[in-house]
Amino acid sequence: MQNNIYYRIHTGKQHGIILDTIPDDVKLVICPDSSSNDYEQHQSLSQKGVDVLVIDHHEADQISQYACIINNQLCDYPTKSLSGVGMVYKFCSYMDELMNVDFADQFLDLVALGMIADMMDLRDFETRHLITKGLENIRNPYFKGMVDKQSYSLKDGISPIGVAFYIAPYVNATIRMGTQEEKLILFESMLDYRGYELISSTKRGCKGQQETRVEQACRNCTNIKNRQTKARDAALETIERIIEEKKLLDNKILAIKLDTFAADKNLTGLIANQLMAKYQRPVLLLNKVVEKVPVYDALGKEISTLASISWEGSGRGYDKSKFDNLREFLKESELVMYAEGHANALGVGITDNNFTTFINYSNQALADFDFTPCYKVDFIFYGDDFRGSDIVEIAELKSLWGQGVEEPLVAIEHINIHNGNVVLMSPDKSPTLKITLPNGTSLIKFKSSQEEYEKLHSETGCITINIVGRCERNIWNGIVTP
């Protein structure tokens, strides 16, 4: 028996089934990490005699009657933190058991990469175990290639937090911003039998030469990530002007309607994250969507069309406040078209007619809610009375941290600042503030400014500050300093 397998790649960061892209001769559609709530598409395919298998982890209102749904959120399976890739691994493991083979574990490195990228909770034993096993034996061509490329940033070892910062964002950027060809190169570089194939080089100055698919994929991802960062920063500048001009910070939820300016739909989630972190409140970043709605006469004849306006985009909850479920809040308002995804990272749509009503509703419902950030610290030290070795010991535990097992925050209080212990390094290019404590501990703040540096000077010669930060260690010529 010969199996004919087709696969398709979304043109952007869409989710779910797009019926027009499914060939007529297909008998089984497999939907990983999506489609639990594509009820109409399930029914349409079922009526054509096409079976649908959904392997997913997203929340849905009900279980589809027209598809086979494997979803840890819709049953009593205890590990709710397995993402789509984790659920696919569980499915493959069961297939191994049925067929008396052992293939699934060969892909544990990709399982780890996927679950880290999807920010799954490492407090669950099964999730932690799968990620640990996957990172212990990285054999996937692309994953290995990116580890080599990011070797300086990962010099302390391969950990969940290292992968989350230095590898996962490059995959994410390619999915959001890459061309179809660039995405295909990326996914094919993850295949054992294709990753190391020689293909025509696209590197500048190397026309006519060849390189492996992995080499090209890793370089592409870096270039795309740089493009994404530039596009994100440019959009942020425009959006922040809109926020100021329209006084949107007067509202409890920062809901931004992009009327004359449209943000790239593949960037709205990233931009919403940045806005949420800066303004410290839930964010809705919404593009204008205009649809033509037909108008019929009494005989059912179309006589004209009306413009239907809605606002659609990304929502982000503020994770440092007690407002811990933006999706639930939106649904309970009964004023949104949809709020789909995770509790605090989701897609949102609202009609133009309901928008002002929703703003008034949220302002009233959250009138007494304080979004002031609360930093829960694990240690409180005093500026002249702690051991630098404590900072080093915490820094050496970096392999443990990840989503749900957050890297410890440390507060240091009563730090005396004077001209002799503070300096602004690289003030013109990348201003970095450095404060040196009596015990040799260095306090470093990147992306500082001349203004911030000058605030640390006093006419009396000394000021006192408190800081909150994370622990790092510096190794130079074999000497370790906090």
Segments from the language model and where they lie:
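Accessory interdomain/linker segments of ATP-dependent helicases and helicase-like nucleic-acid enzymes
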Residues: F381-T441, K447
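Divalent metal-coordination and catalytic microenvironments
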Residues: L28-I30, D56, V88, D118, ...
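N-terminal small/polar loop signature for handling phosphorylated ligands or for N-terminal nucleophile
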Residues: M1-S64, C75, E237, R241, ...
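OB-fold single-stranded nucleic acid-binding module
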Residues: L346, N354-I359, D384, Y453-K455, ...
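Glycine-rich, acidic loop segments that terminate in or are immediately followed by a histidine
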Residues: Q43, M177-E181, E237, K247-G383
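Beta-strand/loop nucleic-acid-binding surfaces
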Residues: G440-S458
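A structured phosphate/pyrophosphate-recognition subdomain
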Residues: E59, I63-L249, V289-A307, E334, ...
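General beta-strand structural signal in soluble alpha/beta enzymes
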Residues: Y7-I9, I30-P32, L53-H57, I69-N71, ...
